[in-house]
């Protein structure tokens, strides 16, 4: 609907999302890290693979203006604990109208590894992604890229990650979400 007319060479893709924290909460987190590290962050990588590889997806790397680069392992950092406990989700995420099995795109993409319900033969230390064709164009694309990548067909039941068929649920102890967190512009 957005593009008004159909484009034959356009493929659309959507991403299965865990939830999104507010820009204000992220800005507050960056300020906290700057104070703790006594410096100014120039970059933060929340999925750093440089020190421990792909098997440790929750390694954080902080690059600072003075040239320091620091690594914090796993979920020991405040951000990871809050994010994965669903304590900083935007309320709109819990009502997301796009989170359902009737996807509007040609292809749906998701992280698909380290899932307790995943078939053991699909596990890989390099990670596994879900590529789900939703249209004929999506099926053609998957057939076209099948050669250079390793693909396995799975049942629809196998694809039912918690965030695919329905929005994430709110944490029962989630604090009231600050009103200004919705409108706060993100800062570098």
Q: Can you describe what each PLM-predicted range is?
A:
Residues 1, 19-21, 51:
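Gly/Ser/Thr-rich loops at beta-strand to alpha-helix junctions
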Residues 19-29, 120:
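Short, charged, surface-exposed secondary-structure boundary motifs
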Residues 3-15:
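A short alpha->loop->secondary-structure connector
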Residues 12, 22-26, 89-92:
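Internal, well-ordered alpha-helical segments in soluble enzyme and binding-protein domains
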